[in-house]
């Protein structure tokens, strides 16, 4: 596959009708009768049926196959807090993937609100429109509480894609990579660079699959997450290590079997990859720029099992695979 350039990406989004999604009718509309059934006066009848039995919304409207992809733009890909509007191309892209891979219709909704309570209120207010909510690109730790509350307070499915979608697909990749490497998950040493929603959820699923907490080292922007630190939230405390001999990624990666990167680009050097155990597994999943490029990782050592989140490199680990 050819490398994706800035020019090609901008042209793809702007050529023809701008954007990537549209709304199309599902019923006939060519005659006056069709239009009278679609809207007034015919539309009153399904309204009255739904008033009597709200479940009939699934019979008479698109609700059952309509998902809201909702974001406030505070953690967009590896770009960070770029704002609700700037994140819209990503939400449209997720809508496109829902449609082509799962046949699910999507409205992308960008909410310009960082306060968790107000964001929750906004989602709850529009929830009757949808059959499901897909939370997207919301920063940690707020995303954990937002998802928990919405699951408790809404009567439709709620999923935070960055947590659960990434966890499912990266875990599948890890299981396969361990088979190739001839290693067992309960024995491998795992280094996780990043401590946001995706990293936490991925690592929790690794633990449920058999990885041992004592074999896991997680890092955030301040370095190794250790029990000596006093600035940790609940999610980070769960993964805090007892080790006092490591503080940086360079120190933590020595002898590791697995590297999971959900942080930012170009933080893993070739020397770090060389310092890992035989047949190391490197999942450099930062987007759009991986923690180390595929070319650099493969050049560092021939036995590396390498994956990224990009579709223009081999071994893509991306939520879309789960659709």
Label each region the model flagged.
Residues 1-156:
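N-terminal ligand-binding/catalytic initiation module
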Residues 77, 84-102, 160, 164, ...:
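Glycine-rich phosphate/diphosphate-binding loop of Rossmann-like nucleotide-binding domains
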Residues 108, 134-137, 158-161, 192, ...:
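General beta-strand structural signal in soluble alpha/beta enzymes
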Residues 127, 185, 252-253, 273-276:
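A short, aliphatic-rich alpha-helical micro-motif
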Residues 163-176, 308-323:
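Short alpha-helices
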